[in-house]
Amino acid sequence: MTISPIPGLLFVYDQPPHSIYVLPFVISAAALCYFIGLIVFNLWFHPLARFPGPLLARSTLLWRMRMTLKGRIHRSIEAGHQKYGPVLRVAPNELSFASVSSWKSIYGHRPGGMIPTKSEFYDMYGSGFNSLCIGSERDPEKHRQMKSFLSAAFSTKALLEQEPLVSQTVDAFITRLGNDGGSETKGLDMTKWTEMVAFDILGEMAFGQSFECIIRGEPHYWQEMILKHLYFITVADNLRRLPFALTLARFLAPVLTAVRNKHSQFTRDKVAERMTNKNLRKDFMSNLISKVESGEVDREEMTAHASTLIIAGGETVATFLAATVYYLLKTPEVYKAMREEIRNRFPTYESINATSAQQLPYLQAVINEGLRIYPPGSQGFPRLSPGLAIDGEWIPEGTEIYTSAWTVTHNPQMFKDPMKFDPNRWLNEKSTDIKESSQPFSLGPRGCLGRNFALMELNLILSKLCWKYDMELMDQSLDWEGQSKVHVMWDKPALTVRFHSVDGSTLKA
């Protein structure tokens, strides 16, 4: 308290205590000490301190955040493995592996042993729903139960019943390519059109009706919403690792929640429409609907399953198709050999079917090579260690682990000339390539449920596409992988292709 020094005036005023000025410095000093202490702990006292990696990766989350947000994390991890070896510390509590054996250790069946569970990353698949689903369920036993009743939709019998529905959409796709991207045009962006056909197929299979992207000639807004917000999912995946994640989550909630709620409500609406459609068509939902009606499965769970099928199933197929078309057109001798095999096997377009296409050895080699050189899940499938040994190293419980799919499939010790698109490596019995290094669908009890359905799509589309047209890449300077980014899934460049009909016929859409 101080008395006024001005004559004639006498009043008392409060002077702020000295501590108010000091407080910001105290807080700053405490924060600095905390972060210095955290860095010291991560570098020398953390359970993973013995594992090599870039200094910034071992000490903080900054290296991981920078590389994932740039979209080149797959290349950064590959470079890290080249420098530091088969085990790389990507973040203070995260390890990447680059060995064949790590596939089985992390993802394979472990009789009588603890199974590495999915990490928190997979929570995004159930976000916005009041139920877990095949994508977000992290409990191994509950996941097994979900997979068992969903698997009926992906059996050999079910695939044969579903093929006419898929073929109908594929035929419309093939027709539009020729009509809108024919010899007298500037071509079409196959990155966009493969996403559209994959989305239309999943609309038929999950909701009983196409999204009509192919008919309208433009992507559905739901598809665009999913793709445009993959970057925000990458941001959220990084933020969940921070000690103040909940505060940041509340700050970002208006942005992320609006998108999430729009997505989940649209899924609910589409499932409601499918539930009222009592036709006898066989699709992904037909078996689930009977279980919902009998009370075995909750309707919200069914909705969350449908959402996962759309997100995971559509983009992975589209990614493979666009990438494989690019590599085919950049490797003329491969493209020529594949066209000849397909056209020699099928006398007419109408005679093409998935079962026969899957018997074509060179086509299967092309598919395997496409999945190797540009794996849809290139960043890896993150798991949490229960406390186990991988490649002779004990990995403490709670460590986030994965096999770097990109690194193992682009390692010269695994595949000769790994950047070369060479389907013959899958046909040559004398090849020294370690083919089990490529696991695009993962493996073990949580391997991709839709693997066989995806292969049916790929065989049908590639066979019909290469039978009907000679394709022309309009931009020969395009560096497909170099211009791609990874934000959970691939963010791909435009791929402009022109289609020259080989027989001049017009298909009925």
UniProtKB/Swiss-Prot annotation:
GO biological process entries: mycotoxin biosynthetic process
UniProt-listed SUPFAM superfamilies: Cytochrome P450
Pathway the protein takes part in: Sesquiterpene biosynthesis
Extent of the signal sequence: none
Glycosylated residues (UniProt): N353
Transmembrane segments: 20-40, 309-329
GO cellular component terms listed in the entry, alphabetical order: membrane
Bilayer topology annotation: Multi-pass membrane protein
Alphabetic keyword roster: Glycoprotein, Heme, Iron, Membrane, Metal-binding, Monooxygenase, Oxidoreductase, Transmembrane, Transmembrane helix
Binding residues for heme: C448
Protein name: Cytochrome P450 monooxygenase ORF9
Organism: Penicillium roqueforti (strain FM164)
